[in-house]
Amino acid sequence: MKHIQKTLLVLTLLSGILFSAHAQEEFFKAPDFAQIKRDVTSSSSSYYYPTLLEKYMTSDAMMTPQEGRHLYFGYVYQPGYVPTDTSSHNTLLAEALSRKSFTPQDYTNILQSADALLLEDPFNLRALNAKLLVYAQQNNTEAYKKVARQRRIVQDAIVGTGDGMSEKTPFYVIKVAHEYDILPFLGYTFGGEDKILKGNKVNYLSLGENRFGVERVYFNISPVVDHVSSHGGGKM
């Protein structure tokens, strides 16, 4: 009963997030990676990856939820896909954002670090959030709207895959870092524990105290595990 109550609370939150994007679709649906791979690698497909990426980079307001899903999960089949998150620009961005007040040069530095991260990972939510912070402070409405649309595409792709309440209904992500980055969007904070379930491609993050009473959120990291395994193992 307790699990059901928590699930209903989270579904209430997610329904507000996803209603406009997924009103005509099944509420949650795990990604079909085999189908996505066929679609994004076929030049005759409406989901051909270069076309989707161009739409995303130009922040096309007409990009559909299915296109967003293919864009995000189809990235694992692109040469630039690297599931690890070890860029030095993460540190530079964190340092720039840690200031109590910002100068115009600070804003420039934040944007430079964010753009550098997005070159390595176009779906880096931390970088997108950092750009939104700067554009809001600069009252740059057009730039803010563009980045906000990009962030929404990434968020919808992730939260449309499950409810995160169990290992059977996890959120799917293509980078472990995206787990942490999606938590604030869901109304959560990280509680300090990150555990991969034995013999599985699912892990969970424990949560800080929250109004839903949820203790942990589950994520499927199969793209990460598969990529690392195919390259001889290593850090995820």
How would you label these PLM feature ranges?
Residues 1-29:
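Bacterial Sec-dependent N-terminal signal peptides
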Residues 24-107, 168-236:
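N-terminal alpha-helical interaction modules that lie
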Residues 136-159:
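TPR/TPR-like (Sel1-like) alpha-helical repeat modules
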